[in-house]
Curated annotation (Swiss-Prot):
Stated family: Belongs to the G-protein coupled receptor 3 family.
UniProt-listed GO biological process terms: adenylate cyclase-inhibiting G protein-coupled glutamate receptor signaling pathway; chemical synaptic transmission; G protein-coupled glutamate receptor signaling pathway; neurotransmitter secretion; positive regulation of MAPK cascade; regulation of neuron apoptotic process; regulation of synaptic transmission, glutamatergic
PROSITE patterns, per the entry: G_PROTEIN_RECEP_F3_1, G_PROTEIN_RECEP_F3_2, G_PROTEIN_RECEP_F3_3, G_PROTEIN_RECEP_F3_4
CC per GO annotation: cytoplasmic vesicle; plasma membrane; presynapse
Protein name (database record): Metabotropic glutamate receptor 4
Protein source organism: Homo sapiens
Positions contributing to L-glutamate binding: S159, A180, S181, T182, Y230, D312, K405
Amino acid sequence: MPGKRGLGWWWARLPLCLLLSLYGPWMPSSLGKPKGHPHMNSIRIDGDITLGGLFPVHGRGSEGKPCGELKKEKGIHRLEAMLFALDRINNDPDLLPNITLGARILDTCSRDTHALEQSLTFVQALIEKDGTEVRCGSGGPPIITKPERVVGVIGASGSSVSIMVANILRLFKIPQISYASTAPDLSDNSRYDFFSRVVPSDTYQAQAMVDIVRALKWNYVSTVASEGSYGESGVEAFIQKSREDGGVCIAQSVKIPREPKAGEFDKIIRRLLETSNARAVIIFANEDDIRRVLEAARRANQTGHFFWMGSDSWGSKIAPVLHLEEVAEGAVTILPKRMSVRGFDRYFSSRTLDNNRRNIWFAEFWEDNFHCKLSRHALKKGSHVKKCTNRERIGQDSAYEQEGKVQFVIDAVYAMGHALHAMHRDLCPGRVGLCPRMDPVDGTQLLKYIRNVNFSGIAGNPVTFNENGDAPGRYDIYQYQLRNDSAEYKVIGSWTDHLHLRIERMHWPGSGQQLPRSICSLPCQPGERKKTVKGMPCCWHCEPCTGYQYQVDRYTCKTCPYDMRPTENRTGCRPIPIIKLEWGSPWAVLPLFLAVVGIAATLFVVITFVRYNDTPIVKASGRELSYVLLAGIFLCYATTFLMIAEPDLGTCSLRRIFLGLGMSISYAALLTKTNRIYRIFEQGKRSVSAPRFISPASQLAITFSLISLQLLGICVWFVVDPSHSVVDFQDQRTLDPRFARGVLKCDISDLSLICLLGYSMLLMVTCTVYAIKTRGVPETFNEAKPIGFTMYTTCIVWLAFIPIFFGTSQSADKLYIQTTTLTVSVSLSASVSLGMLYMPKVYIILFHPEQNVPKRKRSLKAVVTAATMSNKFTQKGNFRPNGEAKSELCENLEAPALATKQTYVTYTNHAI
């Protein structure tokens, strides 16, 4: 009794009492209808125990109206499901025998504030107004119908409505079982401790949707949520699960206002299009908002652009997609696993205006369902609306499909019935009807029995609750498909703790069975690394591995080892090809040709000289140094073969030895010759005595001394840096690794080559200087001028060699150009010496043997006279062949010399 309540109990309910006092004047009158008759805003069915019911019979009103248009499926179907379940329980002798369940069913109008006002009816009996002192004008007591005591509530539908109602019901310890509210917030047992539901929490639904997104290989999606607990909590759960599982990023997260302004949905579509790659849109919204989003997408000409994924509020409903089939095509929706209740189909199809008077909204449903009017006064002139005949039948004269939550409404009512049955069995054992311990029913005790129920639902599914009052997660997955101008929701999979998705049964607009893309960035190609966008792990830029880098993993490029280059797709490394100058290379043709011809010519000259070794012209050329010079020329030509041969230890050692040795031998011999001529000529200017070291033995000694310096340098080089072959990967390490080559070569650097040839060049320059100094020697004094011409030409060859050789050091064909240039230059130098010094002699020997005769002896005195008096007889000598003026001079001077018997050295046959 109120008088026995504690002070704390009343203090906690003081705000509610004040609220009820405002409604007090109207509520008794509204509840004072005769038994069994409906109210204008609720259904009342009498029984021993009364259950409350909350259903969205109407949608949200506009322009200040609390209620809008009738909801045939979400409202009437579900409401009738509760009435159907009550009838079954009341007629079941094994469930609550001799106890009748009554009901008080209210319309929430899909609005939480309106539902709050309506739900005050459920607690009115708990806060009774003492009317003993109230008297009517006649002095009698007022006629007030005592409100029924509601022991439990079935509903509500929307999560925001359930949350609002749960906050009141928990104060009065009235258990509540929802058939459709799935917001994760309602799992908070500390705030909504008297709330339970036969549908799974959106936490499970969010996990299922994340699994679907991943299975479809989408990683960049947008979310749309209706303002309120259901939409916002659902999207929040989806985002949380996507972060936990990874691999899914949110492009846009849009919230639909509770009272959207004009153009709000067009703005939402424009915002979704800002991230056009995110074609998948996750929708946690009520069906009205879903429909308006689809309409806005059609207005924006985005039919087929978005791929919708709807939560259970969309499910398999027709209303959200009616006349929007093309926009909604391909939509993937999720719905708690359910089965059609055939008994309900028979029940609902049999409802008529005559046998269903307890449903105060059934007449309105009848008019809306059959497009007719019950009253003639409601018919407008000129209207095509007909008058209802009451002979219309559901399913025959109108389309009918069982609403998706009917099963759960029935299961919720049965859960309450089973809990009351177990409670009656324990508290009233053996008693028929209610016992004092259940009159009134204690809500806290009833809640414990509700949480412990375990039975098979109307469709054979198990009905249980966990400690938070949630049902286990079991979902069916649908896709809205258009086939042959007909649209249907087709089951494509299920989810019970993990996903079972039949992708082959899916069909997408424009692409058939090919999975559409909803990704932030396209996958990187092989050889590219991902550079993720900060804060968006699903978005990245693809950066190619450059240069000699290869792809180690998705995020890393690494440089290949120095002797390797990346593969074509840059996913690994492969050895760099090793090149060398091949015998058949075009670069080797000219050097080999010159070398072969030169060696042949050299051997021919040697053979000729050996054959005619004792002839005057061979003797006059200085046989000893001539053969040394020919040996040097031969080595110059032979060096070409060493330069083209494959580099190895032996080849590289021979290159070091013979590359400069052939030239050193040649120029040492020529230098010795020019130096001998110069010394004889200069000595003749000063005295008639012979210069020292002009004998053949001395000349050979000088030549070999000069050559030994070259050999000594080579020996020191071998000791300091032993010869070996190397593969140079830097020489042709091009910017494009496809053209990179390793060059197999000897360890002779450019600096080493300069040092190797430097001594030969020094001999060549010195020889050239002597050739210039002896340019005035008479032609009869052997080879002074031919040697001069040889050295001038050789200098020109090597001056051309230097810029070509060192100017191509950065060329990709450096190996070929430098080797060819070096070998050709050496061969040309040898050819110049061979051609200018020996070919004229060979020509005379072979073709003009008559000229190969001894000349008259010339004395040193003649040489001296020629050196001192040559200018005097220059003009005369120019008119006489072979220096006859000088001969005459010598002959004129010979007689006095004999008379005085002066001693002098005589040279025979011009062997100077």
